[in-house]
Amino acid sequence: MLASYASDPLKSRGRLYREIPTSYRNEFERDRDRIIHTNAFRRLQYKTQVFINHEGDHYRNRLTHSLEVSTVARSIANTLNLSSDLAETIALAHDLGHTPFGHAGERALNECMKEHNGFSHNAQSLKILTLLEKRYAAYRGVNLTWEVLEGIVKHNGPISGEVNEYIEEYNSQNDLELNTYASAEAQIAALADDISYISHDLEDSIGAKIIDFNNLAELKYIDQHVFELKSKYKNISSSCLIYEVVRKLMHELITDLLWQTKTNINKEKITHIDEIRNLNYQIVDFTEKTNERIKEIKKFLHERVYKSNRITAISLKCTKIVQGLFKVYMEDVNLLPVNWKIQIDSNNPNSKARIIADYIAGMTDRFAIQEYNQLCSLNFNNI
């Protein structure tokens, strides 16, 4: 049974374009299915999480990461008597707007767009779901419920100060109440993302031999798990050891989050979802001690993994590809597919750059590499 402060699909604020409900799925389940059926969701399979797709078959990509986040979010929401369908749906959609080549690709595209209001993967997720996906005759986008769109835009908290151009444009026709917190389910999706990526980036980095267990000794909290597991299982393999470490880490993070969130709900005497939205802090959270540990792990990953020579070298190549593609398309829009070129508004000075950014952002790693080799390489064998 859902808690009184949960997002109830029967009480949804609805969709921008009214639709008749179905008898066999609630509104959030329907949204989940629509997201899974988008082209953007399928493309996540060939988009970088940390390691480029061709580096190995067992490294996580944006799709496997999104699936893992959704399972964590669903479990947490279930335990708290919140809408697991909404938490799962927001988690599945949270990375739809990512460029090829992960954060390196996003930084490169944002740099290309600095004179055209920049690029944000969060805003791009909204744009994909409300404009760029073309699956239905009656409207553009996939016409998701207000709660899902709110969660995608605000899962990291209220939006204040300068608002992204597309978020502001969409918000003018469907007010997402940008100055408030999102639902507890959206907050769960955001922290499920943190739990998943710090755990699994550690696992993948050990597997890729970017770091080893000696490096993990820098994280006393993690090193203690390593010591205990080695003591218990004398002949444990490295692959099994890191899996067990990550398993323990995820369990402890989830357990901690559940305890602190229940404590917050009880302290604030929460009885309605609007009380969650109007609080002056995030209701779903870790304990202070665990937040500090998470910061340590993120710092470790940043210094030891994301800034490693191997990842840095790959990132430089990826940056060159994204910026190279942007440059050639800006110089000659006839290189764009016709269905993209015709969308350019000659009366809008930002239109060309924005359409090109949308096109590049939707590329998979391998398609971006292929396009770059075709359009930017001096190797005439590519012609």
UniProtKB/Swiss-Prot annotation:
Keyword field: Hydrolase
SMART domains: HDc
HD domain boundaries: 62-198
One Pfam family hit: HD
GO biological process: dGTP catabolic process
Single annotated GO MF: dGTPase activity
Alphabetized PROSITE patterns for the sequence: HD (PS51831)
Gene3D superfamilies cross-referenced by the UniProt entry: Hypothetical protein af1432
Classification via InterPro entries: dGTPase, dGTPase-like, dNTPase_2, HD/PDEase_dom, HD_domain, PHydrolase_assoc_dom
Transmembrane region(s): none
Family: Belongs to the dGTPase family. Type 2 subfamily.
Name of the protein this chain belongs to: Deoxyguanosinetriphosphate triphosphohydrolase-like protein
